[in-house]
Amino acid sequence: MSTHPFPRPLWTLNIAAWLLLAAWVAQIAPAQSDVAELRLTVKDAAGGNLPAAVELVNEAAHTRQRVQLPPDGSYAFRNLPFGFYRLAVSQPGFATASALLELRSAVPVAREVTLGIQPLESTIEVTDAGTLLDLNQTANARYIGAQQVKERRAGQPGRGVIDLVTMEPGWTLEANGVLHPRESEYDTQFVLNGFPVYDNRSPAFAPAVEAENVESMRAYTSGIPAEFGEKLGGVIEINTRRNTSPGFHGTAVAQGGSFSTASGFFSGEYTQGATSASISAEGFLTDRYLDPPVTENYTNHASSSAFTAALDRDWTQFDRISLSVDRRETHLEVPNDLLQQAAGQRQDRNSSDTAGRISYQRILSPSLIGSVRVMVRDTSAGLWSNPLSTPISAAQNRDYREGYFNGSFAGHHGRHEWKTGVEARYASTDEQFGYLIGAYKLLGVRVIDSGYPPVYAFAGHALDREQAGYVQDMIRLGNFTVSGGLRFDHYSLLVNQSGWSPRAAASWHSQSLGIVLHGSYDRTFGTPPFENLLMSASPATSALNGGFYLPLKPSRGNYIEGGFGKAFGGHVRLDASYFRRDVRNFEDDDLLLNTGISFPIAYHSATVRGVEAKLEVPRWGRFSGYLSYSNTIGIAQFPITGGLFLDDGAQALLASTDRFPISQDQRNTARGWVRYQILPRLWTAWSASYNSGLPVEGADQLPDISFLAAEYGSNIVSRVNFDRGRVRPTFSLAASAGIELWRHENRSVTLQADITNLTNRVNLINFAGLLSGTAMAPPRGASIRLRAEF
C-alpha cells in the first residue's frame, strides 16, 4: 500500500489573532532599527525647499542609491549599512554639492544641504574612493548590493540568495543548496528585515526567499554582535525594503531556460508622504530542482509560489510602525537513482511557510531609540512514497509554530554606540514519521542492517521555550575601535540548558596607509535544529540500532579571528583573515538516502581552522570584479548522538572516539567574477568556481565498484577518488551578457542571457556514504531574463 503523509494536527496557528495581539503590544513598547537612517533636507540659499536628485554611494557595502526628492525637499534613507558614504546632491541651475558622511548609529541622522552660492561644506568634489574601505570595521563583513542581485547569473530555482552568498570566501555549498559557513552544518542564521529565522532554509527543507525580492544582503562569520544568538556559524542579513522616490514603482521579471524552467516575479510599491505600501508575488516551474544522484535527472519536477505584502507608516517624526505578511510553498519530486527508477519509485515532498511580522520604532531622544518586534510563523513539511519505493518507503509530516518577541534600546553617547535588548520564543513542534523497508539487499548487496524492524512509526510533540538578553557597546578611540558584548541564552526543548556568551572585537586603522587591522573573539551557544529533532533524540529511535539514548544538547564554541583590510589606489581592496573554531557538541546531519530529509546529529567535538582572502575591484572605469579563496581544515571526533542510521555497522559510531574530517571539509575553494561595461547600455560578465572536493564518509565500507556503477552510473563513480576518500575537484565557468533595451527617467527594460557550466563538465558534489547522499551539479544550461522597472 502507499505510504501517505500523516494528517496535519487539528490545531492550527491563527495568524490574524496573533497579529492583533502584536499590534496591541507594539502600541505600548518601543523599538529600534539595526541599521542607519539618514534624514536629508535640501534647500536653496533663500531657505526654500528643492526637489533635488540625490545619490548615496558606499563602495565597501556595495550600496548605490539614487532618489528624486519630493517637492518639500525632504527624504529619509533607511536600511543603510554602517560605514562611509559619498553624498551628492544636484539640481538644474544650482551648483552640485558633495560630502563624505559616516553613518554609525541606529539613531537617525539629520542632514541639511544648501544648494546655491555656498554649497555644502566644500566646493571640492568628493569621490567614491573615500568609501572603499570601512576604517572602523572590526571584522570582515561581506556585502551584496542591489546591482549584484539584479545582474546575478541564472541558477537553479530557489537558490538566488544562496548562489550569491557562496561566491564569498568562507561559504561552501553541499547537495541541494545547503550552506556551510566555515564548514558548519545546520548553523546558518537568516535575518529577514530584522527578524531572525533559525531553521534550515535550503531548497530541500523550506521555500526560499528568492533574490528578486532582495535589495541588499550582508553576510559575516566573525565579530558577531551579542544581539545575535543560536545559529552563529554564519549570519545572513537580508533587506527587502527599497528607498524609492514618491509615487508608484514596480518591477516585473520573466525568465525561462534549460530543464523546462520558467519563473515570474512582480512587485509594486506606492509611497505617499509618510506611508509606503508594497506587494509582491513570484513563482516557478522546473524539471531540475534538487541535485540528482544520476546524470539522467529522473523525477525532479518542482513548483513554487510566494506572496508578500508590507505596510510602513510614520505616524510622527518620532514614531514608525511596519507590518508584513507572507506565504510561501513548494511542491517537489525526489530524484531517483538508476535502481530506484527501474523499480518504479515515486516520492513527493512539500513545504510551506506562513508568517506575520510587526515592528514599532520610537525615537525617545536625539540620542536614544527603542523598538519592539513581534513575529508569528508556521512552517511545515511532508513526504509521500509510493509502494514501489526502494529500498525503503517513508512518510513524514512535521510542523513548527512559533511566536517571537524582541525588544531593544540603542543609543549614542560620546564615543559610545550601545544597544541592549531581550528576546523570547514560544513555539511547539510536531513530528510524525514512518517507514516500511522493502529490501534489505539490492543486487545481493546489503544496504540496510538486518537488525532493523521492517516497519517503524514515530509521533512526537514538544514545546520550545527560549529566552535571551544581551548588551553590547562600540567605542571609538582615535585610530582604534573596540566593541564588546555579553549575551545570555536559555534553551528548553527536550533539554534545559543555558549559557553566557561574551563577544569582543577590536581594530586599528591608518587612513594615510589605507589599512585596517582587526581581531575578534566570539563565544557561542548554538541550539540544535528543530527539524526532525524529536525523532533523532528519541530513545525509541536509538534502540533501532542497539544504541543508547543521548539527548542532543546545545553546542558551545569559541571562535577567534585575525585579519586586515587594505585599499590600493582608491580602486582595489584586499581583505584577508585567519580563523579557528573549537566546538563541543558539533552539529551535523544524517541524510535519509536521496530523499533530502535529514536527521540532526552531533559529534563530541570539532575543530575548524583556515584562511580566507578576497581581492576586489568594486568599480574601476568599465571594469569591476573580485577573486576569492579559502583554505579550511575541519576535524571532528566521535562518539555520535542522534540520527537515523540504517547502514550496516553504524552502531560502532556510538562508542567510537576516532577523529575524522567532517562531512563538509572542503579544503580549497576559489571563486572569481569580472564584469566589463562594453557600451553604456551593454555589459558582459564571467564567473568561475573551483572546489577541491568533499569527503566520502565511510569510503572503506562502500560496496564494490560494480554495484555503485549499477546504482549511479560509471560516469558518476569515476568522479570519486576512492584512494583519497574524496570527491574529485569540480570546476564551473559561466558567462552573462545584458543590454538595456529602453530607458526613460526611472523606467527601463533590460534583457540578460546566461550560460552556466560552459564546458559541460560532470561535477559531483557529494557521493553516497554514511552521512551524505549522492548529488551532482547541473550540466550546461542557458537562460534568458527580461526585467521591466517602472
Predicted regions and their residues:
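Membrane-embedded beta-barrel scaffold of Gram-negative outer-membrane proteins
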Residues: 371-375, 381, 509, 551-609, ...
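Periplasm-facing N-terminal accessory domains of Gram-negative outer-membrane beta-barrel systems
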Residues: 27-142, 196-198
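C-terminal beta-signal and adjacent terminal beta-strands/loops
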Residues: 4, 681, 689-711, 728-732, ...
